[in-house]
Curated annotation (Swiss-Prot):
Positions annotated to bind Zn(2+) 2: 323, 326, 346, 351
Region called Essential for interaction with AGO1, residue ranges: 934-1206
Gene from which the chain derives: mei-P26
Molecular function in Gene Ontology: ubiquitin protein ligase activity; ubiquitin-protein transferase activity; zinc ion binding
Domain notes: The C-terminal region containing the NHL repeats is required for interaction with AGO1 and for regulating ovarian germline stem cell proliferation. The C-terminal NHL repeats are also required for regulation of brat expression. The C-terminal NHL domain binds single stranded RNA in a sequence-specific manner; preferentially binds uridine-rich RNA with at least 4 U residues followed by an ACA anchor sequence (5'-UUUUACA-3'). The NHL domain is essential, but not sufficient, for post-transcriptional regulation of mRNA translation. The N-terminal RING-type Zinc finger domain is not required for post-transcriptional regulation of mRNA translation.
One BP term from GO: gamete generation
Subcellular localization, as worded in the UniProt entry: Cytoplasm; Cytoplasm, Cytoplasmic ribonucleoprotein granule
Positions annotated to bind Zn(2+) 1: 262, 265, 286, 290
Protein name: Protein meiotic P26
Induction annotation: Post-transcriptionally repressed by bam-bgcn in a 3'UTR-dependent manner possibly targeted by let-7 miRNA. Post-transcriptionally repressed by tut; tut targets a specific long spliceform. The dcr-1 dependent microRNA machinery is involved in post-transcriptionally repression; target of bantam and probably other microRNAs.
Length: 1206
């Protein structure tokens, strides 16, 4: 026998059992009467049961006595004087004894509500309170079944009462839908109404509501969980609804008991089935009766084996719910008018008549279910809204703190700014004071000096006159008197006036300044509007002032713009006037030349007028803007004068003429001039018509090319040639063929008839001069520009003859079309190439390789524009000559459009690279080696304290999923980002205690469990702490033997490796904090800066030694990688999946990466020329080949796309 330790609650004496209830010896409901539902039904005590089981079975109409729930240890008030046993007590031999203050009542009572009968389990109870053994199965099988049942509807935690933390007994539902035991709720009510009673009094008696109903003074009961109030009626806790779902599930958990007796008869035979309508277990006889008797015709009988088999499919045990008014009637109907379930008797009494509309419960369920489902859907939507709102509020709280920090910093910055302004004003005032003081001091000192001089002269004159008066005779006195008098009178007239009225005061208005400072220092902008009239008025005044200032600024900008337009218009007018004057001067000069060199024959003059002049003018038309594409000539449309002013009016040199025929020559020259003007107008009209026709055809050709031809079918020079000359207008560089208008077909050389080159417009002149500039360079540099690297070695200096008579030097031939490459004829240095004619705009637009090569070389030399074509990463030693001429990278929009004209470097193999750059990229000539440029894939971070900002971060690492984990040193935190820079989460609180962060310098991740290893200062010089993958503190590791952690890594075994930069030493530490081993490496390096681990080898960067030292895990030195020319001040190292060693440095404010093999052979170099960096810390390579580094002084993280193939 097992004695229960929990106290047993005694039951009150109840009224006799109502009719219709079967005579049962003992009725036990499962799980401590969880299956029983009492609805205020009175039960009474009957005759006492005998001491033996046989005598107790003979008593009819008796109910069970008091009992105890073996799981919860508490009695149930719904079974009279005996609490029913729970599911765990069924099938085990249990002794029901009294351990409390009240003994078990002998008389047996019967549940007055059929719902309380539960499964109808019959148990014999003797006079000693012992129960008959029902089954030999233990608790384990029942618990397993109960777990399977709980997975259907509720969790295990929902079976426990949140007040007593035990299994629910007679669960009651509050209005907030929280479920508690009936006794626990009654205890809460009793505690409120009977403050004098002991809190343990609830455990010594059962509260069924009969004794305390008159003493209920609490109108509401407050939920112990959510504090929501639930109104209580006159019946108190008994009026609260029961949790039928939990009751049914707990009923289902009792099916494991093999010995379940029949509850429908007195035979006490083993039950084989259960009737859902009678809510009784049936023996074999009762089961047959249900099959053949008409009174059980519609009853649903289920065998116990089927119940246990279908336990996972659906909750199939539902006991009938009886009417609270008519205890023998089931609730079968639903009154829509009253919205309550009813029974047959209710329909005949309280719900009769046409005013009440009712249906069966099955029919009414559909309508009510739809309404509840809609309500539940709306409830879930509201829950989602609350969830989102909660997330938003959390973000708003974080954002509010961030804004607080930002505004605080802004206030500090504003104060510092205004302070600097005041200090600047103070300095200006002091300087002004010094100047005023100096000026007045000089004036006073000058006046003093003048007074002293005048005083000396006066004294001298007075002494001289006094001596004459005293010692001179008459004649001497008379002779000296005029001189003395004149001098004295002169000195007295020249005596300066002493008007000293200099005041130096300072006028200040502190009251006005204070008011102005308070108004202009700054205002807070929040969502709250102050409704006070005074503040509203001040705010409106400030807004009006700001609007007035904005309007004044706009007016000033408009006025300035108008003035600029007027000035520009005036300048254009002046330029037009100058052009007209220049044209007139040229015409006069031509006329004088023609008069001096007139021909003797009129035929010769006429012939010259019909050929040479037209030739010269049409030659000018070739290089005028009207021969350009429409995108280059838009500024010339509709302006005939400007177009004509750009024409060259110079003819071919005429033949010399005799001076004898001067009069006839003048007449002929005037006629020639008139004819020339007429011909100019005709040619201009013809050219304009040809231009319109040409533009229309260009548009048609572009549409056809897009629809029918791929873009790569033709080279860029040929496409430009087609766009510029669709009708053969520009056939070759420097040649024009005009076939338009009524005039004759004229073929004109762009250079004229052996004369000088024609005059161009300003745009043509600038571009042609740029294209011709590199041909005047020194021979050495020009030869170097003409050399490119190839796959097999340096490309020889080649001059290729291309159509049009132009030449291409060096590697430009490699980027030209295949047809041009086949026409290479000679080998000579580039300096030996002498252009036979100047480069014109037509040469550039027609694809002349000499012009394009010169422009490309100029772009490479002057701008270092990373274009394709010349500076290739070859093995030529001559190209290193250009390293002294390279400038920082820049962009040239005008030259950038010429990139596609010259062939790319994809045709040239860069076999000396282990990590090959993508086609289309060029090599950057650095001071160390030729490196492949790295493009910035992502850059994130800035100086600040907000989320995603940094303050001098000292270290980072890659996480398990290649997250970027940054040690934000001066912000005392760790931030975790994805590879695109999005902040995932952060952790860390500033402080020196354990679990806090104080200037974290290095961070690493254990890939086997995702834990973070963080090195910071703490109370000591160095400290190491372990955090979980969610950022929760786990333990501290004391590393007093390390001064400054320069590098941090984790081995494959999970050991932490730290290197000390003060005394170069490598320490291997276990996760528990034990020092596994260490070795001194000061003999092989000067200052460590980072460490990487591959297999059993340790790669340690030597910052001051400009190399990487490689050690075995036992400290044995192996070799060094790198040198000062390649790896200058290395500060980051990582090893790719292929085993290549990547060493990074930021020397020269450019992040540079050198790629070595594990044996130490240099394979390739990369460099990022797009951003200047300072003090980069660390280098990591992702699985895609992206290189990640941390710029400490720039306060950001760089993710670079190296196109690394391994």
């Amino acid at each position: 026998m097992t004695t229960l330790e929990e106290p047993v609650q005694a039951a009150d004496t109840v009224d006799p059992c109502p009719p219709g209830i079967p005579n049962l010896k003992t009725v036990l409901s499962d799980d401590a009467s969880n299956s029983s539902v009492l609805e205020d039904i009175d039960v009474s005590n009957t005759s006492s049961s005998s001491s033996s089981s046989s005598s107790s079975s003979s008593s009819s109409g008796s109910c069970s006595g008091s009992g105890t729930d073996t799981d919860t240890g508490k009695g149930s008030s719904n079974v009279g004087s005996l609490d029913v046993t729970s599911s765990s007590s069924i099938g085990s031999e249990t002794s029901i004894s009294s351990t409390g203050s009240t003994a078990i009542a002998g008389p047996s009572t019967l549940l007055d509500d059929s719902n309380s009968s539960g499964l109808g389990l019959v148990v014999d109870v003797d006079s000693n309170g012992s129960s008959q053994e029902l089954s030999s199965h233990g608790v384990t099988e029942l618990d397993s079944l109960e777990d399977s049942c709980s997975g259907l509807m509720i969790k295990d935690g929902d079976k426990l009462c949140k007040l007593c933390s035990l299994r629910l007994v007679m669960p009651r539902i509050l209005s907030c839908l929280h479920v508690f035991c009936e006794d626990c709720l009654q205890a809460v009510v009793s505690k409120d109404t009977m403050s004098a009673s002991s809190p343990n009094s609830c455990s010594s008696s059962s509260f069924d509501g009969s004794e305390h109903q008159n003493r209920l003074s609490a109108v509401f009961i407050e939920c112990p969980v959510c504090k929501q109030e639930t109104p209580l009626g006159p019946k108190g806790i008994k009026a609260l609804p029961c949790d039928y779902i939990v009751t049914n599930i707990l009923d289902l958990s009792n099916l494991e008991s093999e010995h379940i007796v029949c509850t429908s008869c007195k035979s006490k035979e083993e039950a084989i089935s259960r009737c859902n309508d009678c809510a009784n277990f049936l023996c074999n006889g009762c089961d047959n009766a249900h099959k053949y008797m008409r009174c059980f015709e519609n009853h649903h009988v289920v065998r116990i084996e089927d119940l246990t088999k279908n336990v996972h499919d659906k909750l199939i045990i539902h006991k009938p719910v009886f009417c609270p008014q008519h205890v023998s009637e089931n609730l079968k109907y639903y009154c829509f008018t009253c919205q309550v379930p009813t029974c047959n008797d209710c329909l005949l009494s309280d719900h009769k008549g046409s005013d009440h509309h009712y249906e069966t419960a099955t029919v009414a369920e559909q309508a009510v279910r739809a309404d509840l489902e809609e309500t539940l859907s709306d409830t879930l939507k509201k829950a989602d809204y609350c969830n989102d709102a909660g997330s938003n509020l959390g973000s708003a709280l974080t954002e509010l703190q961030s804004q607080h920090d930002t505004v605080r910093q802004q206030i500090e910055d504003a104060y510092k700014c205004y302070k600097r302004m005041l200090e600047s004003i103070k300095d200006q005032m002091l300087n002004e004071l010094g100047r005023l003081h100096s000026d007045r001091e000089l004036k006073i000192m000058d006046l003093m000096q003048s007074m002293e001089n005048t005083m000396g002269k006066l004294q001298h004159a007075a002494q001289f006159g006094q001596r004459a008066v005293d010692k001179a005779n008459s004649i001497e006195f008379l002779l000296l008197k005029p001189i003395i008098s004149a001098q004295c009178l002169n000195l007295m007239e020249q005596t300066p006036k002493c008007d000293i009225n200099y005041q130096l005061q300072f006028d200040s208005k502190p009251e006005m300044f204070e008011q102005f400072a308070r108004e202009m220092f700054g205002k807070f902008q929040t969502d709250h509007i102050d409704s006070s009239p005074k503040k509203l008025g001040m705010t409106q005044q400030l807004q009006q002032q700001q609007q007035q200032q904005q309007q004044l600024q706009q007016q000033q900008h408009q006025h300035q713009h108008q003035v600029q337009q007027q000035q520009h218009h005036h300048q254009q007018q002046q330029q037009q006037k100058q052009q007209v004057q220049h044209q007139q001067q040229q015409q006069k000069l031509q006329l004088q030349q023609q008069q001096q060199h007139q021909h003797n024959s009129n035929n010769l003059i006429v012939g010259h007028r019909g050929s040479s002049s037209v030739q010269g003018r049409l030659t000018s038309a070739v290089f005028s803007p009207i021969s350009l594409p429409s995108s280059l000539q838009s500024s010339f449309d509709g302006d005939t004068n400007s177009v004509m002013s750009n024409f060259s009016m110079m003819d071919s040199p005429p033949q010399p003429s005799s001076q004898q025929q001067l009069p006839s020559a003048q007449q002929q020259s005037q006629q020639q001039q008139q004819q020339q003007q007429q011909q100019q107008a005709v040619v201009l009209q013809q050219v304009q018509q040809q231009q319109k026709h040409q533009q229309h055809q260009v548009q048609q050709q572009q549409q056809q090319q897009v629809l029918h031809q791929p873009t790569s079918a033709q080279s860029m020079p040929q496409q430009l040639g087609q766009l510029v000359a669709p009708q053969g207008i520009v056939q070759q560089a420097g040649h024009v063929n005009l076939n338009a208008g009524p005039g004759p077909n004229i073929s004109i050389n762009g250079l004229g008839a052996g004369g000088p080159p024609p005059s161009f417009s300003m745009l043509e002149y600038n571009i042609s001069r740029l294209a011709s500039l590199t041909e005047t360079m020194p021979d050495t540099l020009n030869d170097a520009l003409a050399v490119g690297g190839g796959a097999a070695g340096p490309v020889p200096n080649v001059v290729a003859q291309v159509p049009g008579g132009s030449a291409v030097t060096g590697a430009a031939v490699v980027g030209a079309s295949h047809a041009h490459q086949q026409q290479s004829q000679a080998v000579m240095p580039a300096s030996a190439v002498t252009p036979t004619q100047p480069i014109t705009l037509a040469d550039i637009l027609s694809g002349d390789q000499r012009a394009l090569n010169n422009l490309q070389a100029l772009a490479k030399l002057g701008l270092n524009n990373n274009d394709d074509g010349l500076l290739l990463n070859g093995s030529s030693t001559e190209i290193d000559f250009l390293s002294d001429f390279c400038m920082p990278p820049a962009t040239s929009p005008s030259l950038q459009s010429l990139n596609p004209i010259v062939g790319g470097v994809e045709d040239m193999g860069l076999n000396n690279f282990h990590a090959v750059a993508a086609p289309g990229t060029t090599s950057v000539v650095t001071g160390r080696n030729k490196a492949t440029p790295m493009q910035i894939r992502c850059k994130f971070g800035s100086l600040g304290t907000a989320k995603g900002q940094f303050n001098s971060p000292h270290g980072f690492c890659l996480g398990v999923d290649e997250e970027i984990i940054v040690a934000d040193t001066n912000n005392h935190r760790i931030e975790v980002f994805d590879k695109m820079g999005a902040l995932k989460f952060q952790f860390g609180v500033a402080g020196k205690e354990e679990g806090q962060l104080w200037y974290p310098r290095k961070v690493a991740v254990m890939h086997n469990n995702g834990k973070f290893v963080v090195c910071d200062r703490g109370n000591e010089r160095s400290r190491m702490q372990i955090f979980s993958k969610c950022g929760h503190f786990m333990r501290k590791i004391a590393i007093r033997y390390i001064d400054i952690v320069a590098g941090l890594a984790v081995t494959a075994k999970g050991h932490i490796v730290a290197v000390d930069s003060v005394s170069p030493t490598v320490f291997v530490i276990s996760e528990e904090g034990e020092l596994v081993r260490w070795f001194d490496c000061s003999d092989y390096m000067r200052e460590p800066s980072d460490i990487a681990i591959r297999d059993n080898d340790f790669y340690v960067c030597d910052f001051k030694g400009h190399c990487v030292a490689v050690f075995q895990d036992d400290g044995t030195f192996l070799y060094r990688i790198g040198n000062e020319k390649v790896t200058c001040f290395p500060n980051g190292i990582d090893i790719s999946n292929a085993g290549d060693v990547l060493i990074g440095d930021s020397h020269g404010n450019r992040f540079h990466v050198a790629c070595y093999s594990r044996e130490g052979a240099l394979q390739s170099e990369f460099e990022c020329p797009h951003v200047k960096v300072s003090r980069c810390c660390g280098l990591k390579i992702t699985s895609e080949g992206y290189v990640v580094t941390l710029a400490k002084n720039n306060h950001h993280v760089l993710v670079l796309n190296t196109l690394y193939v391994h």
